[in-house]
Amino acid sequence: MSPHVDMSSGSPDGAAPAVQKAFNGFLTENIDESQFPALENRSHLRYTPQDELHDMICVGFGPASLAIGVALHDALDGTDGSLADVQGLQSRPPKVAFLEKQPQFAWHAGMLLPGAKMQITFMKDMATMRNPRSEFTFLNYLHQKDRLVEFANLNTFLPARVEYEDYMKWCASWFEEVVAYSQEVVKVMPEKSASGEITSFNVMSHNHLTGRTESRRAKHVVIAAGGRPNIPAPFPTNHPRVIHSSQFSYMSKQLLKDHDAPYNIAVVGNGQSAAEIFDFLHANYPNSRTRLLIKGGALRPSDDSPFVNEIFNPSRTDCTYNRAPKLRATTLVEDKGTNYGVVRLGLLEHIYETLYMQRIRYGNSPAEEAHWPHRILPYRRVMDVTESPVCQGGVRLHVQDSSALYFSEQAGGQERKETLDVDAVFVATGYLRDLHETLLKDARHLMPGGELEGAKWQVQRDYRVNFTEKSVGEDAGVWLQGCCESTHGLSDTLLSVLATRGGEMVRSLFEKPAKWDNGHVLGGYEVRE
């Protein structure tokens, strides 16, 4: 770290007392709680001054970290009997912090389109599958919002996506005291003790509100930073008219302000997000020409049948992790048809119906189809992206069209090249989940085989990172969330297992009694030297 980096502690004046009472009623006496607003809903977790050693710091405060916070709350209030024996939670409330780069809690806010539904049952919320008695169930949220009866009248397990985000915001509001927003973590650095063993980690973050770099120390660090938008080559990553699907709701309002204008728009991708964007554009920009470019021959339905859904059972995580690596890789490829590059059947049928109506209005022949305002173009690959000489400020897509190889009614179909000039292109090509590799760069010397090019961090079944033997103390470590699909299965990046996994994480993180910096735990009182 540069010696000129501005450090901001953000902690209250005055040191903590030498002796603190042990855990009693979820409060610590050395914290002035008058600095926090009175909250209608408040978790059992309390603010820890920034300069104190934390038991846990979570990098990111999305659904994965939220599930950990919910499980901690349930463990402390006694409603979750499965966590009643966690030793590290017996003497005092844990000292935790969640660092989130966004200014407030948000979940896929850029894809909260009108009418969009969840793709999993509301019962797979932040708590129900682990602790149905929790205050954080979706049903309790509905009860608190006075909508339980009306929701029951909908006769559905699939709430609107906008309502489910509001549910998660409601859950997140309980933890305002321990969440620092606008904090973008930039590195996690190991710290050695006098014995040479790593006993804590320094979490460095950039405060977007102050512009300063801040530092916090923790024994346990959970990296749950989520995915970053994947804009693959040849698309430029910083062009104002090349927009990732995660920003669609925001950017479409800026780029496509006139709903009656004759825009030229392209959507790239063959999954749920691409289909939703294509359908939204068709419905809201009727005078535009919209093209959905897919690499295969057709949009394919997701498989959410009961037997296939067992892939996402929490117990399947054990099965997946314990498989031989080659078998695990094979089954992951088989399972991806349930979630990757597929679309819910109801939306597929709706899109097909809207395209069919164009056959009635504009004609059914191939020549007439070429002039439809909204089309799906199969077997297309974008080979290059340049500035458009036709659409002001837009881009030209240089496309390889392989459809003749598959759809030609005569032998000898040939690939051809085509160009599409568009005012905007929306790229629905998923996410990359590799931020932990960057954050842990200063710990790479602790990675087994870390000197080898291309070596990746490996985790145990409880998501704990494998470090070189005896390099990191038993009471310290790093855990990964949402980037372990190759070892823990397809559900790793999904909502399906969050409630159960949150409980597993609490047990793994706090199984042992917490200690102060000197390592002492003394009866009902914890002593610092």
From Swiss-Prot:
Keywords: FAD, Flavoprotein, Monooxygenase, NADP, Oxidoreductase. GO terms for molecular function: ornithine N5-monooxygenase activity. One of its GO terms (biological process) is intracellular iron ion homeostasis. Coiled coil: none annotated. Its EC number is 1.14.13.196. Signal peptide: none annotated. Gene3D superfamilies: FAD/NAD(P)-binding domain. Substrate binds at K124, N309, E310, I311, F312, N339, S496. NADP(+) binds at N270, G271, Q272, S273, N339, Y340, G341. Pathway: Siderophore biosynthesis. Its cofactor is FAD. It catalyses: L-ornithine + NADPH + O2 = N(5)-hydroxy-L-ornithine + NADP(+) + H2O; L-ornithine + NADH + O2 = N(5)-hydroxy-L-ornithine + NAD(+) + H2O. It is an enzyme of class 1 (oxidoreductase). Homotetramer. L-ornithine N(5)-monooxygenase; part of the gene cluster that mediates the biosynthesis of hydroxamate-containing siderophores that play a critical role in virulence. Cochliobolus heterostrophus produces extracellular coprogen-type siderophores including coprogen, neocoprogen I and neocoprogen II, as well as the intracellular siderophore ferricrocin. The role of extracellular siderophores is to supply iron to their producers in planta and the intracellular ferricrocin is required for intracellular iron distribution and storage with a crucial role in ascus and ascospore development. This is L-ornithine N(5)-monooxygenase. It comes from Cochliobolus heterostrophus (strain C4 / ATCC 48331 / race T) (Southern corn leaf blight fungus).
